[in-house]
Each structure stands twice: as structure tokens, then as C-alpha cells.
């Protein structure tokens, strides 16, 4: 159930950013070629459940993923877990926001029942684990 929900959310994020010039078949191929990687990345961020401004490991995972795909990464001195990933030069400029922070006090397993997860004190009640991974996946898809 969680895996199909992850795919649906990540794919719906991608629809917002995909150029119209691609055929449906080539888009499916591009999206599917990265599916497993970004589903796993979302689940890793879920497991880490780092609260805002302390999501160092989650930030590192996303940065490394984008760097491996040829993006230039710039970190920000005033917010150490935030970063800008750039690919290419010139126009058009497309900006994609990704969030990956967890919320304190909402630890939850991936089951539909109320089950605290690994005694974590934080959790992803708002789906930011999907938002962060989905935004990175979208950027990789449209580059």
C-alpha cells in the first residue's frame, strides 16, 4: 500500500514539471528508469525522520543523488541543510522546491494503524519524505 502511494505522489509531482514536447512513451521510460531509486530514497528519508533545520542526513542523501545525476550543488551558509541544485545554463530556468523535514511527536510506522515507529520522536505526517524525493526525481526527469 505504501509503495503504490509513494509512486502515485511522486508521479503526480512530476506532472507539474514535465515539458510537453516528450511523447508519453519516452516520459514513461524516463520516469520508470529512476523509480526504484527515488522510492528507496523516500523510504530512507522516512526512516531518518529529521526535524526541520536538523535534516542533515536527508539533505546529504538528496544532494548526493542529484550530484550523481550531474547537478551542481550549492549549500547555503545561513541554512546548512538547504541547498540549490543546478543543471545546465541559460533559459528556461525551472525552479522546483523540495521539503524533507519531519515533525516532532508524530512518529508512525507505514501501516494504516496507529503504531509508533522505532521509538522515533519525529515522523513524516505531511509526506515531506515524498515531497523531497519527488522533487529530486522531477528535476532528474526534466533535465
Language model segments and positions:
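Bacterial N-terminal signal peptides that target proteins for export
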Residues: 1-9
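Bacterial N-terminal signal peptides
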Residues: 10-17
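Alpha-helical and His/Cys-centered functional microenvironments
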Residues: 18, 132
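Sec/Tat signal peptide C-region and signal peptidase I cleavage site
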Residues: 19-23
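Acidic/His- and Gly-rich active-site-bordering loop/insert found
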Residues: 24-124, 133-136, 141-142
Amino acid at each position: 500500500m505504501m509503495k503504490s502511494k509513494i509512486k502515485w505522489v511522486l508521479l503526480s509531482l512530476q506532472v507539474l514539471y514535465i515539458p510537453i514536447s516528450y511523447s508519453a512513451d519516452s516520459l514513461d521510460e524516463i520516469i520508470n528508469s529512476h523509480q526504484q531509486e527515488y522510492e528507496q530514497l523516500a523510504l530512507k528519508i522516512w526512516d531518518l525522520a529529521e526535524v526541520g533545520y536538523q535534516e542533515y542526513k536527508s539533505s546529504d542523501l538528496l544532494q548526493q543523488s542529484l550530484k550523481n545525476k550531474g547537478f551542481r550543488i550549492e549549500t547555503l551558509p545561513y541554512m546548512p541543510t538547504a541547498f540549490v541544485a543546478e543543471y545546465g545554463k541559460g533559459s528556461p530556468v525551472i525552479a522546483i522546491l523540495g521539503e524533507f523535514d519531519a515533525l516532532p511527536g508524530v512518529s508512525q510506522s507505514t501501516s494504516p494503524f496507529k503504531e509508533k515507529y522505532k521509538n522515533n520522536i519525529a515522523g513524516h505526517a505531511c509526506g515531506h519524505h515524498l515531497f523531497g524525493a519527488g522533487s529530486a526525481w522531477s528535476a532528474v526527469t526534466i533535465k
